Curated annotation (Swiss-Prot):
Bilayer topology annotation: Multi-pass membrane protein
Protein name: Plasma membrane fusion protein PRM1
Gene Ontology annotations for the cellular component aspect, listed alphabetically: mating projection tip; plasma membrane
Family to which the UniProt record says this protein belongs: Belongs to the PRM1 family.
Primary residence: membrane
Segments on the Cytoplasmic side according to the record's topology features: 79-159, 354-440, 663-983
């Protein structure tokens, strides 16, 4: 096997997909070319570059988005401070104007007696006049009623007495006369009856005696006795027939009936006694009271009052509140200034760090690009350069260079979330870049800082408001209490003075009425009492003179006292009450007549209190003086909060738009990926069908098909016949950084079409076989050939013990330029490509690990392991790239196979020489073909070695030679060579 230095690339992937490179700045181990332009070039650069350098960036670093946000918030805070000053001035003016209005209101309240006195005096005068007129009318009606009642009573009782006495006397007399006559007749009849009764009784007694004596005679007649009955003589009694009543009784009654009085004289005298005083009294009352008028001008009128108290207002709490609000804004500005200084320092440090990262990223990107471009040009792969200079790659490079922190955060974020695909990482990076755009950050920083400042100001204002509200409220509460007391004193003094004067006038009028008008009532009632007494006395005298000495005198006196005496006593009591209450008693004016009640005072002084104190709310504010200041300041803060909240809302909208864009991109790429997979699957099926057709249609196609169908399976058991233990893998350089995702597609791999995958026994072999290739089946047991080292330093020579086989391998006349793959890594027919400058090799992965990673199985110990495990082949390093250290170097090497020789359990794809005409000698038959042995024919070239000796591996026969120098022959490049990657 010989080294072929025309391909440098990463090992191929077993997945059928395009290999995506990681961000360019991760390639941090490749140094730039010495001939390229560098920032540290010894040539003196111009003073001003077309881009901003470190000094310019450090100069502009303080002017950052957070600083602008802080300045905006500071401007709003300064505006709030000015607003607080204006609010304090406005509050003072409002307080003074409210105090002036309160003085006017208090003066008006204190002058209420002056305004109330005029109307009160008129009303008092009218009430007194109406009272007097009403009293006169009542007295007139009362006197008339009493007069008529007395007259009616007198007439009634007079007629009653006359009729009753006539009825009584005349009826009694008639009864007596009739009674006398009946008594006389009764007495006469009685006497006659008595006479007859007596006579009949005596006759009966005589009869009884005769009967009794006869009975006795009958009894005693037996004895012969005989008694004579006694006999009583019957008297005549003639005197009883002439008994009668005396005639004087009847004569006296008849005489009394003829002499009864008529009481006409008593009636006339009583009428004269009743009508005369009543008529006189009514005439006097009407003449005096009917024309009575009370003059209201005699009542006093209090003077107007002027109340002043504004000079007692203490506005120092307002000044203290204004100073406190200014201090809040001042300390807020100081805090913002300190934060701004910190932000400026952080901005300077950030710009310096970003500059360093950007410079390093540019250097690493340039070095990597130059190295990859040289490799691509050496392989003739211009498409690789085009991929590097694509707009997407350049934009990614600029973004990563300008925003290293965003890229760092994006990578860490993806790493923690387990995001491994490149497109998902790109979407995360795009979202962070979208959210970290200066416009978005300006909205976010300004909104957050503004809300924090508004919140802090609101907390401080609330804490200050409770203290100063209580202070100013206490001061104004004392002032309002003084105002209330002052108004109360003024109104009380005015009311007392007014009531005293008014009562004096009212009492004077009352005395005049009682002395000049109602004294006649006293006279009239006394006269009426005398009249009634005279009437009763006259009636008694009349009855005494009439019935004196008769049995009717006492009953009539009792009757008159019962019927008339009680009524007269009641009338006398009424007249006595009138006499005792016949006077005017006007109500005097109270001392608080012009004073307001407590609820009226509160209603009048409420505007004054509210103008000073305002209506308090639960948060310490209100519409008072302090409440006005606090409310204006809080209203200003509320407007700022709305502004800053709107800015945060704008950032939230930006976030939502970014998430929607990422979601849309994810769904769209997933749909596109599914479509690509479908198309690739269809294309792969078609290619496989075409491959099978080509393999069957070409020369010897049937034999190839049969050979492929009967080819033994690849497994690790073919290496078990060798007991050589594997050589340990060389240690890796601890300073080297491996990033497989950062490797670009190989030039050889990217220049040929997509490989075709043919699945064979669970191992995928990407390859392209020329239709002229033909293999024959082999029935020999397949074993790997041990790898031996040769001493020939020439890498273009091949050592073999069987000259027929080596001659056969060197005299192949057919030469193809098709790129074909063998096994599972990028292999092609060696076509004598131009060499490329060598890269410094670095042991990265051992043969066993590499084999396990490529083929999915472990490598058994074999003779080839001991020589292959430590083999590092490298081309000679050119002088112009001697100082370039390449990490993870890969080199293409060449495998020379003879026709129909074994290789990893299968036959070589190299067809027999065309000159043999398809006939096979016994040496080349399946039963006689020797195994191929891979030997080393050169030394290892290190990255800094000046030795030009190189190593070459070649297949030899199964029979080993004794140790020592072996004959070698010059390797002839032929179509029977397969190039593959080794590292």
């Amino acid at each position: 096997m010989s080294f072929h230095p025309n391909a440098v690339d990463a090992p191929p992937s077993y997945l059928h997909q395009h290999q995506a490179g990681s961000p360019l700045y991760t390639q941090n181990t490749i140094r730039p070319n010495a001939n390229s332009t560098d920032l540290n070039s010894p040539h003196k650069p111009p003073i001003l570059q077309p881009w901003l350098g470190l000094q310019a960036r450090l100069f502009l670093a303080p002017i950052s988005i957070p600083l602008i946000s802080l300045l905006f918030v500071a401007a709003r805070m300064l505006s709030s401070s000015n607003e607080a000053t204006d609010s304090i001035s406005s509050a003072k003016g409002k307080l003074l104007s409210a105090c002036s209005a309160a003085e006017g209101t208090a003066s008006l309240a204190a002058s209420f007696p002056h305004f109330l006195a005029a109307s009160t005096n008129v009303q008092l005068a009218l009430s007194v006049t109406a009272t007097v007129h009403s009293a006169a009318r009542v007295f007139d009606l009362s006197m008339t009623a009493i007069q008529k009642i007395l007259t009616y009573i007198v007439n009634s009782y007079k007629s009653l007495f006359m009729c009753f006495m006539e009825l009584l006397v005349r009826g009694a007399l008639a009864v007596l006369i009739t009674a006398v006559e009946f008594i006389s007749q009764a007495i006469t009849a009685a006497t006659l009856g008595i006479r007859s009764a007596i006579q009949e009784s005596i006759t009966g007694v005589n009869t009884l005696l005769a009967t009794a004596v006869g009975a006795i005679n009958d009894v005693i007649g037996v004895f012969g006795q005989h008694v004579n009955p006694p006999h009583i003589a019957v008297p005549s009694l003639t005197s009883l027939e002439n008994i009668t009543l005396p005639h004087e009784i009847q004569d006296g009654l008849v005489k009394l009936n003829a002499t009864l009085p008529t009481l006409q004289q008593l009636k006339q005298s009583m009428d004269a006694l009743i009508e005369t005083p009543f008529e006189e009294m009514k005439r006097e009352v009407n003449a005096t009271l009917a024309s009575f008028q009370f003059n209201h001008s005699v009542f006093p009128v209090p003077e107007m009052q002027n109340v002043t108290f504004c000079d007692r207002i203490d506005t120092s709490p307002l000044d203290e509140l204004g100073n406190a609000l200014k201090n809040v804004a001042r300390w807020g500005l100081v805090a913002l200034l300190l934060i701004a200084i910190v932000v400026m320092l952080i901005g300077v440090a950030w710009e310096w760090w970003k500059w360093q990262k950007e410079v390093k990223a540019v250097e690493r990107t340039r070095s990597l690009w130059l190295a990859q471009r040289s490799s691509a040009h050496s392989d003739g792969n211009d498409k690789f350069c085009d991929n590097i200079l694509k707009t997407e790659n350049l934009m990614s490079l600029l973004t990563i260079s300008q925003h290293p922190l965003i890229s760092f955060c994006s990578l860490n974020y993806c790493k923690r979330l387990g995001i491994r695909t490149r497109r998902a990482q790109d979407r995360c990076a795009w979202l962070l870049s979208f959210l970290m755009h200066p416009a978005s950050l300006a909205c976010l920083f300004t909104g957050v800082l503004g809300l924090i400042s508004v919140l802090m100001q609101a907390i401080l204002v609330h804490s200050l408001s409770h203290h100063y509200v209580s202070s100013i409220d206490t001061s104004l509460a004392h002032l309002s209490s003084d105002i209330v007391n002052l108004v109360h004193d003024h109104t009380r003094n005015a009311s007392v003075a007014f009531s005293t004067s008014a009562n004096t006038v009212i009492l004077q009028v009352e005395a005049e009425l009682n002395d000049h008008v109602f004294r006649w009532v006293d006279t009239t009632t006394s006269t009426m009492n005398s009249t009634l007494n005279q009437f009763v006395d006259g009636l008694t005298e009349t009855l005494t003179s009439t019935f004196g000495g008769t049995p009717f005198n006492a009953p009539l006196q009792t009757f008159v006292q019962c019927i008339l005496g009680q009524k007269v006593q009641g009338i006398e009591k009424a007249l006595t009450w009138i006499h005792e209450n016949a006077y005017v008693n006007f109500s005097v004016v109270p001392a608080d007549v012009l004073m307001l009640r407590p609820e009226q005072q509160e209603a009048v002084l409420r505007p004054v209190r509210e103008a000073m104190l305002g209506s308090r709310d639960d948060q310490g504010g209100g519409n008072g003086v302090v409440g006005h200041v606090i409310s204006r300041y809080m209203e200003h803060l509320h407007q700022e909060k709305i502004l800053f909240t709107a800015l945060i809302g704008v950032y939230a909208i930006i976030l939502l738009i970014g998430l929607l864009a990422v979601l849309y991109a994810t769904l769209a790429e997933r749909r596109m990926h599914d479509d690509d997979e479908t198309r690739k699957k269809v294309s792969r099926d078609e290619s496989e069908e075409k491959l099978r057709s080509d393999l069957q249609a070409g020369p010897g196609g049937a034999g190839i098909a049969r050979l492929w169908s009967r080819r033994p399976k690849l497994n690790a058991g073919c290496f078990r016949a060798f007991s050589h233990p594997p050589v340990p893998v060389s240690a890796q350089n601890p300073s080297s950084k491996i990033d497989h995702a950062a490797r670009f597609p190989s030039s050889a791999h990217s220049s040929r079409p997509d490989p075709i995958h043919v699945t064979k026994d669970s191992i995928s072999y990407p390859f392209q076989m020329h239709h002229s290739l033909n293999t024959s089946p082999s029935t020999r047991p397949t074993q790997p050939t041990p790898l031996q080292q040769t001493s020939n330093p020439d890498r273009d020579t091949v050592q073999s013990l069987h000259h027929a086989s080596t001659t056969h391998n060197q005299t192949a006349s057919t030469r193809t330029k098709e790129y074909d793959s063998w096994l599972c890594f990028l292999a092609s027919y060696h076509d004598g490509e131009a060499t490329v400058p060598a890269k410094a090799p670095e042991a990265v992965e051992g043969a066993q690990d590499r084999f396990h990673r490529l083929f999915g199985c472990s490598l058994r110990a074999s003779p080839t392991v001991a020589t292959f495990n430590h083999h590092v082949s490298a081309p000679a390093v050119s002088s112009d790239r001697a100082e370039i250290e390449v990490e993870d170097a890969r080199f293409r090497e060449t495998l020379d196979l003879g026709s129909m020789q074994d290789w990893i359990g299968s036959k070589s794809p190299i067809p027999p020489p065309a000159g043999r005409g398809g006939s096979h000698s016994p040496r080349n038959t399946a039963d006689q073909l020797p195994e191929v042995q891979l030997t080393r024919s050169g030394g290892c070239v290190g990255p800094h070695s000046s030795d030009s000796t190189q190593e070459t591996y070649a297949f030899t026969d199964s029979v080993r030679l004794p140790p020592g120098p072996q004959p070698q022959q010059k390797r002839v490049v032929s179509s029977q060579s397969i190039s593959f990657f080794a590292w």
